[in-house]
Amino acid sequence: MNSPLIKVHSQKWSKEWTRLFLSKKHWICILDSPIDQKLVKECQRYPISELDRVTKNFYSKNNYENIMKKLVYLISCDYTNKNIKLIDGYHIQLVYVKKLLQQDFNNAIVLVNTAISWIEYAVAAKFELVENKHGHSLTRKIKKLSNDIDKYSKKDPKKTYLVELYQVSLCLDDLWDTNKQNFEDGRYNVGIGRHSIQHGRVDPRRYNAEIMEKLICLLYALVKLPEIEDVIK
């Protein structure tokens, strides 16, 4: 990661550094979340080599209590609010998904495809491409977001929400990067992302709790973050 944000927040174990480090593993932590604040505080007590394990345990302990809290937040959102980038149909799906995961989190094997559709809708809505003939340009928009973050980070690397937006951008870049999802690698080895999931190139047995948790955390961040143009301007 060569973003100016990394250089500015290079002090180990600062809140920003911890969140940026976790984002390399696609664990998204945002400021406006008591759940994420608790995770960051927990991570600051451990060496770097333990952070991935600590995060996995944080979300899986007590019958996935913390990930369920994020689902409860998403379910309780006011879907009439234009700033909430989901629609009633996805709200209904979230209710059913929560029930299935509460019964057995291994039900993620049949839910990852659904979660990817939430992510794509939320991102398209952020870029105002849901009902737009240029919807296919979503990949370019995601790449442009990364470049914009770098540009604005050089101007004001401590600006509120840039770290959050950088985390989300990093995750979206990887999810949409077809170069990391080569079909010829086969269903047991192909990179797991939007392209390989939507086109059915991944053996569903690879859809585990961790992947589902990360997608829920990403959706949670996309819904809670302010509008992109309010951050980068």
Language model region names:
Residues 24-27, 31-51, 56, 86, ...:
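Charge-enriched interaction surfaces
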Residues 70-89, 153, 157-160, 179-183:
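An acidic intrinsically disordered interaction segment
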Residues 19, 53, 57, 66-73, ...:
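Charged/polar, solvent-exposed surface patches and flexible loops
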Residues 80-120:
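A long, hydrophobic alpha-helical segment
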Residues 106-233:
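Amphipathic, oligomerization/interface secondary-structure segments
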Residues 11, 37, 44, 93, ...:
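Residue-identity detector for glutamine
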